[in-house]
Amino acid sequence: MIKEYREKYNSEFSEETYEKFIKYLDGLCGHKIEFRIAETPIFLPDHLLTEIISASDELTSAISTKEFHDFTRNAIPPGLETPNEEPHPSLLSIDFAICKGEDGKLHPQLIELQGFASLYCYQELLNEAMRKFFFIPERGKSYFYVKDHEEYVEEVRKAIVGDTDPENVILMDIEPEKQKTYIDFLATEKYIGVKPVCITEVIKRGRKLFYKRDGKEIPIERIYNRVINDELERRKDVKYNFSFQDDLDVKWIAHPNWFYRLSKYSMPFYKSKYVPETRFLSDFEKFPDDLENYVLKPLFSFAGVGVMFDIDRKVLESIKDRENYILQKKVVYEPIIETPDIPAKAEIRLLYAWDDKPLLLNNLVRLSKGKMMGVDFNKNQSWVGSSIAYHNRTF
């Protein structure tokens, strides 16, 4: 999107270099990455970066209010509340589509917020590999309010480990080695010393949790939680020894209640030019006539499961539990990233840590040429997948 950078990058790109880049990235943690990595980063022009920062500032201010807490009081499904909720999420992701406005300029539109973990450590691996193999401008940086690798890793460490011994912190997921995000788990261990542990290996004694290392029980003081709630609900074969509803003597990073509060449930709360019109399906007395301009989303699903783009009145009228769906104005991604064939669309995720205030650290990008982001909509495509954005600003 910065023309001179794009032209230079594309002219210097080669498939041979890309293959070396992938091999190097796989080798950094000794693990073959299972999701597609795009052939290119994106280069954010300053005017677009200004709008992205402005939009994210609006949103972080909104979720800090009492009104937001009141609005999302019922976001957590009955029986799934975790005790000892904190007043804000310790980790936060904000996803924006890059769109073109009526003024012909690029603008961000909110896709979703998540009070949940993301690929904080993998993105630093990707940044390192991108810089080694491809043209990245000397001024180009992926960080925001940190200046370099050391400061970035330290802020991630503070958010996840804090003052705790890393041995007493676990990254918890369901069969972590089988997750597509396992590369991030390995990168987390590489950078901050926190090891992945399967939820089935956690031991409960009273209010305390433990895991075993070399035959010895190690107390758990912090859980860097990577368990996706709806995956856990589906996996009836997974037996574990505690409940998320237990009053436990641990600190959650991030607290599980924020998975629900900062989800599609909160979208109708935000009133901003950066947020597409969104309402609970149950709030409609009469459905819009132009349903082709709307998308239907279930509240409690992950990774695009259940999202319907082509809807009609009959579909909406057949839904009984309308309070569990939102109807949202479609966001039109602008195919703006020049590639060797057709332009790609971009979605940028801002990665925050939140102690006393939200701190914007890094970003993650997804590129697509399909109807939606994600592998199922980009089969047999190149220059799509996981990526990163660079900008020229010093914060």
Predicted feature residues:
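Preference for protein termini
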Residues: 1-395
